[in-house]
Protein backbone atom coordinates (compact mmCIF):
# COMPACT_ATOMS: atom_id res chain seq x y z
CA UNK A 1 0.00 0.00 0.00
CA UNK A 2 1.25 3.47 -0.86
CA UNK A 3 1.55 6.03 1.91
CA UNK A 4 2.37 9.68 1.38
CA UNK A 5 4.44 11.77 3.74
CA UNK A 6 3.72 15.49 4.03
CA UNK A 7 6.36 16.39 1.43
CA UNK A 8 4.99 13.90 -1.06
CA UNK A 9 1.46 15.01 -0.28
CA UNK A 10 2.26 18.65 -1.00
CA UNK A 11 4.07 17.71 -4.21
CA UNK A 12 0.99 15.92 -5.49
CA UNK A 13 -1.60 18.48 -4.52
CA UNK A 14 -1.67 20.23 -7.88
CA UNK A 15 -2.50 17.03 -9.76
CA UNK A 16 -5.85 17.21 -11.59
CA UNK A 17 -8.88 16.35 -9.50
CA UNK A 18 -10.68 13.13 -10.32
CA UNK A 19 -13.39 13.63 -12.86
CA UNK A 20 -16.49 11.53 -13.40
CA UNK A 21 -18.03 8.11 -13.18
CA UNK A 22 -16.76 5.61 -15.69
CA UNK A 23 -17.25 1.83 -15.78
CA UNK A 24 -14.60 -0.40 -14.29
CA UNK A 25 -13.01 -2.81 -16.77
CA UNK A 26 -15.10 -5.76 -17.77
CA UNK A 27 -18.38 -4.54 -16.31
CA UNK A 28 -20.32 -3.90 -19.50
CA UNK A 29 -23.31 -6.21 -19.69
CA UNK A 30 -23.12 -7.22 -16.03
CA UNK A 31 -26.46 -7.61 -14.25
CA UNK A 32 -26.49 -4.52 -12.07
CA UNK A 33 -29.76 -5.17 -10.26
CA UNK A 34 -28.15 -5.36 -6.82
CA UNK A 35 -29.79 -6.05 -3.46
CA UNK A 36 -29.79 -2.30 -2.88
CA UNK A 37 -32.68 -2.00 -5.32
CA UNK A 38 -34.83 -4.35 -3.27
CA UNK A 39 -33.72 -2.81 -0.01
CA UNK A 40 -34.60 0.66 -1.14
CA UNK A 41 -37.92 -0.38 -2.62
CA UNK A 42 -38.85 -1.53 0.89
CA UNK A 43 -37.38 1.66 2.33
CA UNK A 44 -39.78 3.65 0.19
CA UNK A 45 -42.55 2.13 2.30
CA UNK A 46 -40.77 2.11 5.67
CA UNK A 47 -39.25 5.58 5.82
CA UNK A 48 -41.05 8.86 6.17
CA UNK A 49 -43.78 7.81 8.59
CA UNK A 50 -47.17 9.43 8.97
CA UNK A 51 -46.87 11.35 12.22
CA UNK A 52 -49.65 9.55 14.03
CA UNK A 53 -52.16 12.23 13.09
CA UNK A 54 -52.30 11.20 9.45
CA UNK A 55 -51.65 14.69 8.05
CA UNK A 56 -48.19 13.99 6.61
CA UNK A 57 -48.56 13.07 2.94
CA UNK A 58 -46.83 13.57 -0.43
CA UNK A 59 -48.81 16.78 -0.89
CA UNK A 60 -48.27 18.08 2.65
CA UNK A 61 -44.92 17.05 4.13
CA UNK A 62 -44.87 20.16 6.33
CA UNK A 63 -47.54 18.72 8.64
CA UNK A 64 -46.74 15.96 11.14
CA UNK A 65 -49.27 15.48 13.94
CA UNK A 66 -51.77 17.63 15.86
CA UNK A 67 -49.86 20.64 17.15
CA UNK A 68 -46.57 19.70 15.46
CA UNK A 69 -45.30 20.71 12.04
CA UNK A 70 -42.21 22.00 10.25
CA UNK A 71 -42.45 25.33 12.10
CA UNK A 72 -42.55 23.80 15.59
CA UNK A 73 -39.54 24.70 17.73
CA UNK A 74 -38.22 21.19 18.37
CA UNK A 75 -35.87 22.50 21.06
CA UNK A 76 -38.92 23.48 23.12
CA UNK A 77 -41.57 20.92 22.22
CA UNK A 78 -41.59 17.24 21.23
CA UNK A 79 -44.56 15.01 20.30
CA UNK A 80 -45.61 12.64 23.06
CA UNK A 81 -45.87 9.38 21.12
CA UNK A 82 -45.80 7.03 24.10
CA UNK A 83 -43.59 4.67 22.06
CA UNK A 84 -40.21 3.11 22.74
CA UNK A 85 -38.30 1.65 19.79
CA UNK A 86 -35.93 -1.16 20.80
CA UNK A 87 -32.86 -2.36 18.93
CA UNK A 88 -30.01 -4.76 19.60
CA UNK A 89 -26.58 -4.14 18.07
CA UNK A 90 -24.06 -6.96 18.34
CA UNK A 91 -20.45 -6.12 17.49
CA UNK A 92 -18.26 -8.89 16.10
CA UNK A 93 -15.04 -9.21 14.14
CA UNK A 94 -14.15 -11.46 11.24
CA UNK A 95 -10.80 -12.49 9.77
CA UNK A 96 -10.01 -12.95 6.06
CA UNK A 97 -13.22 -11.31 4.94
CA UNK A 98 -14.05 -10.88 1.26
CA UNK A 99 -14.97 -7.22 0.84
CA UNK A 100 -17.57 -5.59 -1.43
CA UNK A 101 -15.03 -5.16 -4.25
CA UNK A 102 -13.58 -8.67 -3.96
CA UNK A 103 -10.43 -7.83 -1.98
CA UNK A 104 -9.78 -9.94 1.11
CA UNK A 105 -9.29 -7.95 4.32
CA UNK A 106 -7.50 -9.68 7.17
CA UNK A 107 -9.90 -8.19 9.72
CA UNK A 108 -13.19 -6.31 9.81
CA UNK A 109 -15.57 -5.35 12.58
CA UNK A 110 -19.32 -5.59 12.03
CA UNK A 111 -22.65 -4.59 13.51
CA UNK A 112 -25.15 -7.46 13.31
CA UNK A 113 -22.82 -9.18 10.82
CA UNK A 114 -22.67 -6.23 8.40
CA UNK A 115 -20.09 -3.48 7.82
CA UNK A 116 -22.95 -1.00 7.73
CA UNK A 117 -25.20 -1.79 10.64
CA UNK A 118 -28.99 -1.78 10.68
CA UNK A 119 -30.82 1.51 10.41
CA UNK A 120 -32.17 2.81 13.70
CA UNK A 121 -35.54 4.27 12.82
CA UNK A 122 -38.10 6.08 14.95
CA UNK A 123 -40.66 8.85 14.83
CA UNK A 124 -40.08 12.31 16.21
CA UNK A 125 -40.75 12.10 19.96
CA UNK A 126 -40.19 8.36 20.35
CA UNK A 127 -37.83 6.97 22.96
CA UNK A 128 -35.10 4.75 21.54
CA UNK A 129 -33.55 1.94 23.55
CA UNK A 130 -30.50 0.23 22.09
CA UNK A 131 -28.71 -2.73 23.66
CA UNK A 132 -25.09 -2.89 22.49
CA UNK A 133 -23.34 -6.24 22.95
CA UNK A 134 -19.57 -6.14 22.49
CA UNK A 135 -18.33 -9.50 21.18
CA UNK A 136 -15.07 -8.07 19.86
CA UNK A 137 -12.02 -10.08 20.87
CA UNK A 138 -9.92 -7.43 22.58
CA UNK A 139 -11.37 -3.95 21.93
CA UNK A 140 -13.64 -2.02 24.18
CA UNK A 141 -16.23 0.18 22.51
CA UNK A 142 -18.79 2.92 22.98
CA UNK A 143 -21.47 3.91 20.49
CA UNK A 144 -22.14 7.58 19.78
CA UNK A 145 -25.43 8.77 18.30
CA UNK A 146 -24.00 11.41 16.00
CA UNK A 147 -25.88 14.71 15.91
CA UNK A 148 -28.49 13.69 18.47
CA UNK A 149 -28.62 16.47 21.06
CA UNK A 150 -29.20 14.14 24.01
CA UNK A 151 -31.13 16.87 25.79
CA UNK A 152 -30.86 16.20 29.51
CA UNK A 153 -29.26 12.84 28.68
CA UNK A 154 -25.55 13.60 28.22
CA UNK A 155 -24.81 10.30 29.96
CA UNK A 156 -26.21 8.54 26.85
CA UNK A 157 -23.90 10.33 24.36
CA UNK A 158 -21.68 7.27 23.96
CA UNK A 159 -18.18 8.74 24.24
CA UNK A 160 -15.77 6.56 26.21
CA UNK A 161 -13.52 8.54 28.51
CA UNK A 162 -16.06 11.37 28.55
CA UNK A 163 -19.59 10.15 29.30
CA UNK A 164 -18.82 6.51 30.11
CA UNK A 165 -16.18 3.83 30.43
CA UNK A 166 -15.84 1.61 27.36
CA UNK A 167 -17.99 -1.49 27.10
CA UNK A 168 -15.59 -4.40 27.69
CA UNK A 169 -15.10 -7.02 24.96
CA UNK A 170 -16.00 -10.72 24.95
CA UNK A 171 -19.65 -10.19 25.83
CA UNK A 172 -19.89 -6.91 27.70
CA UNK A 173 -23.10 -4.98 27.13
CA UNK A 174 -24.77 -1.64 27.75
CA UNK A 175 -28.27 -0.28 27.24
CA UNK A 176 -28.55 3.24 25.82
CA UNK A 177 -31.86 5.08 26.10
CA UNK A 178 -32.60 8.51 24.68
CA UNK A 179 -35.41 10.49 23.10
CA UNK A 180 -35.67 11.60 19.48
CA UNK A 181 -36.20 15.31 20.08
CA UNK A 182 -35.03 16.09 16.52
CA UNK A 183 -35.93 14.58 13.18
CA UNK A 184 -34.09 13.86 9.96
CA UNK A 185 -31.02 11.82 9.06
CA UNK A 186 -27.93 10.91 11.02
CA UNK A 187 -25.74 7.94 11.95
CA UNK A 188 -24.18 6.05 14.83
CA UNK A 189 -20.58 4.97 15.16
CA UNK A 190 -18.00 3.72 17.59
CA UNK A 191 -16.11 6.43 19.47
CA UNK A 192 -13.35 4.05 20.63
CA UNK A 193 -10.10 5.15 18.97
CA UNK A 194 -10.46 4.77 15.18
CA UNK A 195 -12.64 1.69 15.53
CA UNK A 196 -15.51 2.93 13.37
CA UNK A 197 -13.16 2.82 10.38
CA UNK A 198 -13.23 -0.97 10.72
CA UNK A 199 -16.99 -1.05 10.08
CA UNK A 200 -18.87 -0.13 13.26
CA UNK A 201 -21.31 2.38 11.80
CA UNK A 202 -24.97 2.56 10.84
CA UNK A 203 -27.68 5.05 9.80
CA UNK A 204 -30.27 6.78 11.95
CA UNK A 205 -33.59 7.97 10.51
CA UNK A 206 -36.02 9.97 12.64
CA UNK A 207 -39.27 10.46 10.74
CA UNK A 208 -40.79 13.92 10.90
CA UNK A 209 -42.04 16.81 8.76
CA UNK A 210 -40.10 18.25 5.83
CA UNK A 211 -39.78 21.67 4.23
CA UNK A 212 -40.76 20.47 0.74
CA UNK A 213 -43.07 17.83 -0.68
CA UNK A 214 -41.88 14.53 -2.13
CA UNK A 215 -43.46 11.25 -3.20
CA UNK A 216 -40.96 8.54 -2.25
CA UNK A 217 -38.51 8.26 0.66
CA UNK A 218 -35.53 6.23 -0.56
CA UNK A 219 -34.05 6.01 2.92
CA UNK A 220 -30.43 6.48 4.03
CA UNK A 221 -27.58 6.35 1.52
CA UNK A 222 -24.27 6.27 3.42
CA UNK A 223 -21.03 6.92 1.55
CA UNK A 224 -17.62 6.09 2.97
CA UNK A 225 -13.98 5.79 2.13
CA UNK A 226 -12.84 2.17 2.20
CA UNK A 227 -9.39 0.85 3.09
CA UNK A 228 -7.96 -2.63 2.70
CA UNK A 229 -5.82 -2.16 5.82
CA UNK A 230 -7.32 -1.90 9.29
CA UNK A 231 -8.04 1.46 10.87
CA UNK A 232 -5.77 0.54 13.77
CA UNK A 233 -2.74 0.17 11.52
CA UNK A 234 -3.64 3.29 9.58
CA UNK A 235 -3.79 5.33 12.79
CA UNK A 236 -0.29 4.21 13.72
CA UNK A 237 0.99 5.05 10.25
CA UNK A 238 -0.54 8.53 10.31
CA UNK A 239 1.37 9.24 13.51
CA UNK A 240 4.50 9.31 11.36
CA UNK A 241 3.35 10.20 7.84
CA UNK A 242 0.52 11.70 5.84
CA UNK A 243 -2.64 9.63 5.29
CA UNK A 244 -2.89 7.28 2.32
CA UNK A 245 -5.62 7.58 -0.32
CA UNK A 246 -8.58 5.34 0.28
CA UNK A 247 -8.56 2.14 -1.74
CA UNK A 248 -12.19 2.54 -2.78
CA UNK A 249 -15.46 4.32 -2.00
CA UNK A 250 -18.55 2.46 -0.81
CA UNK A 251 -22.05 3.56 -1.78
CA UNK A 252 -24.54 2.05 0.66
CA UNK A 253 -22.01 -0.73 1.25
CA UNK A 254 -21.36 -1.51 -2.44
CA UNK A 255 -18.38 -0.82 -4.69
CA UNK A 256 -16.69 -1.83 -7.92
CA UNK A 257 -12.98 -2.60 -7.89
CA UNK A 258 -11.35 0.05 -10.11
CA UNK A 259 -9.16 -2.42 -12.03
CA UNK A 260 -10.55 -5.95 -11.69
CA UNK A 261 -14.24 -5.05 -11.99
CA UNK A 262 -15.11 -7.26 -9.02
CA UNK A 263 -18.05 -6.23 -6.89
CA UNK A 264 -21.25 -4.37 -7.76
CA UNK A 265 -22.35 -0.83 -8.30
CA UNK A 266 -24.92 0.34 -5.80
CA UNK A 267 -28.15 1.04 -7.65
CA UNK A 268 -31.08 3.23 -6.70
CA UNK A 269 -34.49 2.93 -8.30
CA UNK A 270 -36.33 6.07 -9.46
CA UNK A 271 -39.89 6.35 -10.74
CA UNK A 272 -40.49 8.67 -13.68
CA UNK A 273 -42.47 11.75 -12.66
CA UNK A 274 -41.95 11.24 -8.92
CA UNK A 275 -39.93 13.25 -6.41
CA UNK A 276 -37.60 11.17 -4.27
CA UNK A 277 -36.08 11.99 -0.89
CA UNK A 278 -32.52 10.69 -0.50
CA UNK A 279 -30.72 10.78 2.85
CA UNK A 280 -26.99 11.30 2.24
CA UNK A 281 -24.48 10.51 5.01
CA UNK A 282 -20.68 10.75 4.88
CA UNK A 283 -19.45 8.05 7.27
CA UNK A 284 -15.83 8.31 6.13
CA UNK A 285 -12.75 8.45 8.31
CA UNK A 286 -10.92 10.85 5.96
CA UNK A 287 -12.51 11.43 2.53
CA UNK A 288 -14.82 14.36 1.82
CA UNK A 289 -16.97 13.99 -1.29
CA UNK A 290 -18.33 16.15 -4.09
CA UNK A 291 -21.59 14.58 -5.29
CA UNK A 292 -23.49 15.01 -8.55
CA UNK A 293 -26.16 13.10 -10.46
CA UNK A 294 -25.87 13.36 -14.23
CA UNK A 295 -28.64 15.53 -15.77
CA UNK A 296 -30.36 16.01 -12.41
CA UNK A 297 -30.31 18.70 -9.75
CA UNK A 298 -30.80 18.08 -6.03
CA UNK A 299 -32.92 20.18 -3.67
CA UNK A 300 -31.57 20.33 -0.11
CA UNK A 301 -34.26 20.22 2.59
CA UNK A 302 -32.15 19.39 5.65
CA UNK A 303 -28.53 19.74 6.78
CA UNK A 304 -27.31 17.81 9.83
CA UNK A 305 -30.82 17.35 11.29
CA UNK A 306 -31.66 21.03 10.75
CA UNK A 307 -34.59 21.54 8.31
CA UNK A 308 -33.80 24.28 5.79
CA UNK A 309 -35.67 26.24 3.16
CA UNK A 310 -35.47 24.28 -0.14
CA UNK A 311 -32.15 25.03 -1.86
CA UNK A 312 -31.39 23.68 -5.33
CA UNK A 313 -27.85 22.61 -6.32
CA UNK A 314 -26.25 20.85 -9.27
CA UNK A 315 -23.51 19.37 -7.07
CA UNK A 316 -22.96 19.08 -3.35
CA UNK A 317 -19.95 18.98 -1.02
CA UNK A 318 -20.42 16.38 1.73
CA UNK A 319 -17.81 16.61 4.48
CA UNK A 320 -16.92 13.82 6.88
CA UNK A 321 -19.73 13.44 9.42
CA UNK A 322 -22.16 15.66 7.49
CA UNK A 323 -25.64 14.72 6.30
CA UNK A 324 -27.95 16.22 3.69
CA UNK A 325 -31.52 15.25 2.91
CA UNK A 326 -32.16 16.05 -0.74
CA UNK A 327 -35.07 15.72 -3.15
CA UNK A 328 -34.40 14.37 -6.63
CA UNK A 329 -37.06 15.00 -9.26
CA UNK A 330 -37.16 12.09 -11.71
CA UNK A 331 -37.97 14.36 -14.65
CA UNK A 332 -35.54 13.00 -17.23
CA UNK A 333 -35.89 10.31 -19.86
CA UNK A 334 -36.20 6.75 -18.55
CA UNK A 335 -32.66 5.42 -18.40
CA UNK A 336 -29.56 4.90 -16.26
CA UNK A 337 -27.60 7.79 -14.74
CA UNK A 338 -24.25 7.99 -12.96
CA UNK A 339 -24.21 9.29 -9.41
CA UNK A 340 -20.62 10.52 -9.20
CA UNK A 341 -18.13 11.19 -6.44
CA UNK A 342 -15.24 13.53 -7.19
CA UNK A 343 -12.48 14.98 -5.02
CA UNK A 344 -11.83 18.71 -5.05
CA UNK A 345 -9.50 21.14 -3.36
CA UNK A 346 -6.45 19.73 -5.14
CA UNK A 347 -7.03 16.56 -3.09
CA UNK A 348 -6.54 18.36 0.22
CA UNK A 349 -9.90 16.96 1.30
CA UNK A 350 -9.38 13.38 0.19
CA UNK A 351 -8.24 11.07 -2.56
CA UNK A 352 -8.85 7.49 -3.62
CA UNK A 353 -7.21 4.79 -5.70
CA UNK A 354 -10.59 4.50 -7.41
CA UNK A 355 -10.48 7.45 -9.79
CA UNK A 356 -14.14 7.16 -10.76
CA UNK A 357 -16.27 6.11 -7.78
CA UNK A 358 -19.93 6.02 -8.75
CA UNK A 359 -23.34 4.47 -8.21
CA UNK A 360 -26.17 3.98 -10.70
CA UNK A 361 -29.58 5.66 -10.47
CA UNK A 362 -31.95 3.65 -12.65
CA UNK A 363 -35.44 4.65 -13.70
CA UNK A 364 -38.03 1.91 -13.48
CA UNK A 365 -38.39 0.42 -16.94
CA UNK A 366 -34.79 1.16 -17.95
CA UNK A 367 -32.55 -1.69 -19.14
CA UNK A 368 -30.14 -3.20 -16.63
CA UNK A 369 -27.10 -1.63 -18.23
CA UNK A 370 -24.39 0.87 -17.46
CA UNK A 371 -25.09 4.57 -18.03
CA UNK A 372 -23.54 5.94 -21.20
CA UNK A 373 -23.35 9.64 -20.30
CA UNK A 374 -20.49 10.39 -17.91
CA UNK A 375 -21.68 13.97 -17.42
CA UNK A 376 -19.54 17.05 -16.91
CA UNK A 377 -17.18 17.85 -14.07
CA UNK A 378 -18.94 19.71 -11.23
CA UNK A 379 -17.64 22.93 -9.77
CA UNK A 380 -14.68 22.43 -7.44
CA UNK A 381 -16.01 23.22 -3.98
CA UNK A 382 -12.48 23.67 -2.60
CA UNK A 383 -13.25 21.65 0.54
CA UNK A 384 -15.89 24.18 1.61
CA UNK A 385 -19.49 23.44 2.51
CA UNK A 386 -22.54 25.61 1.92
CA UNK A 387 -22.89 28.51 4.34
CA UNK A 388 -25.97 30.23 2.90
CA UNK A 389 -28.64 27.68 3.83
CA UNK A 390 -31.59 29.18 5.73
CA UNK A 391 -33.00 27.08 8.60
CA UNK A 392 -36.78 26.86 8.82
CA UNK A 393 -36.62 27.35 12.57
CA UNK A 394 -34.93 30.73 12.82
CA UNK A 395 -32.15 31.77 15.18
CA UNK A 396 -30.71 35.28 14.84
CA UNK A 397 -28.04 37.23 16.71
CA UNK A 398 -26.73 40.78 16.70
CA UNK A 399 -23.15 40.30 15.52
CA UNK A 400 -22.35 43.97 16.18
CA UNK A 401 -22.36 43.23 19.91
CA UNK A 402 -19.64 40.57 19.73
CA UNK A 403 -16.32 41.32 21.42
CA UNK A 404 -13.25 39.09 21.47
CA UNK A 405 -11.94 37.75 24.75
CA UNK A 406 -8.33 36.74 24.26
CA UNK A 407 -8.20 35.35 27.79
CA UNK A 408 -10.24 32.34 26.63
CA UNK A 409 -7.98 31.34 23.75
CA UNK A 410 -7.88 27.64 22.86
CA UNK A 411 -4.98 27.16 20.43
CA UNK A 412 -5.09 24.06 18.24
CA UNK A 413 -1.89 23.43 16.30
CA UNK A 414 -0.07 20.72 14.37
CA UNK A 415 3.15 19.60 16.03
CA UNK A 416 4.72 17.07 13.70
CA UNK A 417 1.88 14.55 13.40
CA UNK A 418 0.28 15.37 16.76
CA UNK A 419 -2.67 17.75 16.98
CA UNK A 420 -2.78 19.96 20.06
CA UNK A 421 -5.67 21.93 21.55
CA UNK A 422 -4.70 24.55 24.09
CA UNK A 423 -1.16 23.20 23.92
CA UNK A 424 -2.30 19.65 24.73
CA UNK A 425 -3.22 16.70 22.55
CA UNK A 426 -6.39 15.32 24.10
CA UNK A 427 -5.74 11.98 25.75
CA UNK A 428 -8.82 10.81 27.59
CA UNK A 429 -8.68 8.24 30.37
CA UNK A 430 -10.87 5.24 29.58
CA UNK A 431 -10.84 4.25 33.26
CA UNK A 432 -11.91 7.66 34.60
CA UNK A 433 -14.42 9.44 32.35
CA UNK A 434 -15.03 13.15 32.83
CA UNK A 435 -18.59 12.38 33.92
CA UNK A 436 -17.17 10.54 36.93
CA UNK A 437 -15.53 13.77 38.06
CA UNK A 438 -18.89 15.51 37.72
CA UNK A 439 -20.81 12.81 39.59
CA UNK A 440 -18.40 12.91 42.53
CA UNK A 441 -18.05 16.70 42.61
CA UNK A 442 -14.33 16.47 41.82
CA UNK A 443 -13.18 19.56 39.90
CA UNK A 444 -9.53 18.51 39.68
CA UNK A 445 -9.84 17.62 36.00
CA UNK A 446 -6.91 16.18 34.10
CA UNK A 447 -5.24 18.66 31.74
CA UNK A 448 -5.17 16.01 29.03
CA UNK A 449 -8.99 15.95 29.02
CA UNK A 450 -8.86 19.44 27.44
CA UNK A 451 -11.86 20.77 29.33
CA UNK A 452 -13.28 24.23 28.78
CA UNK A 453 -15.85 25.02 31.46
CA UNK A 454 -18.92 26.87 30.19
CA UNK A 455 -21.41 28.39 32.62
CA UNK A 456 -24.55 30.52 32.33
CA UNK A 457 -28.08 29.36 31.56
CA UNK A 458 -29.41 29.81 28.02
CA UNK A 459 -26.63 32.17 27.05
CA UNK A 460 -25.05 32.34 23.62
CA UNK A 461 -21.36 31.38 23.59
CA UNK A 462 -19.19 32.33 20.64
CA UNK A 463 -16.06 30.55 19.49
CA UNK A 464 -13.57 31.73 16.93
CA UNK A 465 -11.59 28.84 15.45
CA UNK A 466 -8.42 29.70 13.54
CA UNK A 467 -6.69 27.01 11.54
CA UNK A 468 -2.99 26.87 12.43
CA UNK A 469 -2.21 30.42 11.28
CA UNK A 470 1.42 30.18 12.40
CA UNK A 471 2.15 26.77 10.88
CA UNK A 472 3.85 26.06 7.57
CA UNK A 473 1.05 23.90 6.18
CA UNK A 474 -2.64 23.59 6.97
CA UNK A 475 -5.50 21.24 6.12
CA UNK A 476 -9.27 21.73 6.11
CA UNK A 477 -11.05 20.20 9.11
CA UNK A 478 -14.68 19.09 9.55
CA UNK A 479 -15.43 20.50 13.01
CA UNK A 480 -18.16 18.55 14.83
CA UNK A 481 -19.86 19.54 18.09
CA UNK A 482 -21.74 17.12 20.32
CA UNK A 483 -24.91 18.16 22.15
CA UNK A 484 -25.73 21.20 20.02
CA UNK A 485 -26.21 22.67 16.60
CA UNK A 486 -24.13 25.79 16.12
CA UNK A 487 -24.75 28.95 14.16
CA UNK A 488 -22.14 29.63 11.49
CA UNK A 489 -21.68 33.37 11.89
CA UNK A 490 -18.84 33.60 9.41
CA UNK A 491 -15.70 32.13 7.94
CA UNK A 492 -12.58 33.40 6.20
CA UNK A 493 -12.79 34.43 2.52
CA UNK A 494 -13.25 31.59 0.05
CA UNK A 495 -9.93 30.77 -1.57
CA UNK A 496 -8.51 27.67 -3.21
CA UNK A 497 -7.61 25.07 -0.63
CA UNK A 498 -4.09 24.74 -2.02
CA UNK A 499 -3.27 28.44 -1.83
CA UNK A 500 -2.42 28.29 1.90
CA UNK A 501 -3.20 31.99 2.11
CA UNK A 502 -3.13 32.92 5.77
CA UNK A 503 -6.30 34.47 7.20
CA UNK A 504 -6.24 35.40 10.87
CA UNK A 505 -9.48 36.92 12.14
CA UNK A 506 -9.15 40.71 12.05
CA UNK A 507 -12.05 42.42 13.87
CA UNK A 508 -11.46 45.66 11.96
CA UNK A 509 -12.12 43.85 8.68
CA UNK A 510 -13.94 40.63 9.46
CA UNK A 511 -16.71 41.83 11.75
CA UNK A 512 -18.42 43.11 8.61
CA UNK A 513 -18.26 39.59 7.15
CA UNK A 514 -20.37 38.09 9.93
CA UNK A 515 -24.02 37.16 9.42
CA UNK A 516 -26.31 36.81 12.41
CA UNK A 517 -29.59 36.90 10.46
CA UNK A 518 -30.75 33.27 10.67
CA UNK A 519 -27.41 31.91 9.44
CA UNK A 520 -26.71 28.31 8.47
CA UNK A 521 -26.97 26.07 11.52
CA UNK A 522 -25.63 22.53 11.80
CA UNK A 523 -23.41 20.27 13.93
CA UNK A 524 -20.51 19.74 11.50
CA UNK A 525 -18.87 22.49 9.42
CA UNK A 526 -15.69 22.84 7.42
CA UNK A 527 -12.87 24.93 8.86
CA UNK A 528 -10.91 26.31 5.87
CA UNK A 529 -7.20 25.61 5.54
CA UNK A 530 -5.26 28.55 7.01
CA UNK A 531 -8.59 30.26 7.69
CA UNK A 532 -11.13 30.80 10.44
CA UNK A 533 -14.65 29.82 11.43
CA UNK A 534 -16.84 31.70 13.93
CA UNK A 535 -19.63 29.68 15.53
CA UNK A 536 -22.12 30.14 18.38
CA UNK A 537 -24.17 27.78 20.51
CA UNK A 538 -26.58 28.33 23.39
CA UNK A 539 -25.99 26.92 26.88
CA UNK A 540 -29.33 25.15 27.12
CA UNK A 541 -28.12 21.54 27.42
CA UNK A 542 -25.90 20.62 30.41
CA UNK A 543 -23.23 18.08 29.56
CA UNK A 544 -19.65 17.36 28.71
CA UNK A 545 -19.67 17.83 24.95
CA UNK A 546 -16.80 17.10 22.61
CA UNK A 547 -15.87 19.47 19.81
CA UNK A 548 -13.47 17.73 17.47
CA UNK A 549 -12.27 17.26 13.94
CA UNK A 550 -14.17 14.34 12.41
CA UNK A 551 -11.20 13.09 10.42
CA UNK A 552 -10.40 9.96 12.41
CA UNK A 553 -6.64 10.37 12.14
CA UNK A 554 -6.83 13.92 13.49
CA UNK A 555 -9.01 13.28 16.53
CA UNK A 556 -6.99 10.14 17.19
CA UNK A 557 -3.95 12.42 17.15
CA UNK A 558 -5.50 14.80 19.67
CA UNK A 559 -7.61 17.37 17.78
CA UNK A 560 -10.45 17.71 20.27
CA UNK A 561 -11.60 19.56 23.34
CA UNK A 562 -14.55 19.27 25.71
CA UNK A 563 -17.04 21.95 26.62
CA UNK A 564 -18.15 21.12 30.16
CA UNK A 565 -21.47 22.94 30.15
CA UNK A 566 -23.14 23.80 33.47
CA UNK A 567 -21.45 21.04 35.48
CA UNK A 568 -23.63 21.37 38.57
CA UNK A 569 -26.84 21.22 36.54
CA UNK A 570 -25.44 18.18 34.74
CA UNK A 571 -24.76 16.45 38.05
CA UNK A 572 -28.27 17.18 39.31
CA UNK A 573 -29.88 15.86 36.11
CA UNK A 574 -28.47 12.33 36.36
CA UNK A 575 -30.90 9.86 37.91
CA UNK A 576 -29.84 7.27 40.53
CA UNK A 577 -30.57 4.51 38.01
CA UNK A 578 -28.33 6.08 35.37
CA UNK A 579 -25.61 6.66 37.95
CA UNK A 580 -25.73 2.99 38.98
CA UNK A 581 -25.57 1.85 35.35
CA UNK A 582 -22.60 4.17 34.82
CA UNK A 583 -20.73 2.75 37.82
CA UNK A 584 -21.54 -0.86 36.93
CA UNK A 585 -20.21 -0.37 33.40
CA UNK A 586 -17.01 1.24 34.69
CA UNK A 587 -16.50 -1.59 37.18
CA UNK A 588 -16.81 -4.12 34.35
CA UNK A 589 -14.36 -2.18 32.19
CA UNK A 590 -11.79 -1.73 34.96
CA UNK A 591 -11.88 -5.47 35.60
CA UNK A 592 -10.71 -5.87 32.01
CA UNK A 593 -8.38 -2.93 31.36
CA UNK A 594 -5.46 -2.71 31.60
CA UNK A 595 -4.62 -5.98 33.39
CA UNK A 596 -6.48 -8.30 31.00
CA UNK A 597 -6.14 -6.32 27.77
CA UNK A 598 -3.61 -7.68 25.24
CA UNK A 599 -2.90 -4.25 23.72
CA UNK A 600 -2.04 -0.87 25.24
CA UNK A 601 -3.85 2.39 24.52
CA UNK A 602 -1.88 4.00 21.66
CA UNK A 603 -3.81 7.13 20.69
CA UNK A 604 -6.13 9.77 22.17
CA UNK A 605 -8.65 7.04 22.96
CA UNK A 606 -11.24 8.75 20.76
CA UNK A 607 -11.53 8.34 17.05
CA UNK A 608 -8.69 9.26 16.08
CA UNK A 609 -2.90 24.04 13.57
CA UNK A 610 -6.03 25.60 14.82
CA UNK A 611 -6.94 28.21 17.40
CA UNK A 612 -10.28 28.57 19.15
CA UNK A 613 -11.18 31.30 21.55
CA UNK A 614 -14.42 32.30 23.19
CA UNK A 615 -16.10 35.48 22.09
CA UNK A 616 -18.32 37.20 24.66
CA UNK A 617 -21.19 39.61 24.34
CA UNK A 618 -20.76 43.25 25.33
CA UNK A 619 -23.14 44.28 28.07
UniProtKB/Swiss-Prot annotation:
Keywords: Copper, Disulfide bond, Glycoprotein, Lignin degradation, Metal-binding, Oxidoreductase, Repeat, Secreted, Signal
Binding positions (Cu cation 2): 146, 189, 550
Name of the top EC class for this enzyme: oxidoreductase
Pfam families (alphabetical): Cu-oxidase, Cu-oxidase_2, Cu-oxidase_3
Leader sequence residues: 1-21
Location relative to the cell: Secreted
Effect in UniProt of substituting residue 320 to I: In strain: TS
Binding-site residues, Cu cation 1: 144, 480
Glycosylation sites: 139, 282, 295, 340, 422, 444
Function: Lignin degradation and detoxification of lignin-derived products.
Similarity section: Belongs to the multicopper oxidase family.
Record-given protein name: Laccase
Protein's organism: Neurospora crassa (strain ATCC 24698 / 74-OR23-1A / CBS 708.71 / DSM 1257 / FGSC 987)
Name of encoding gene: lacc
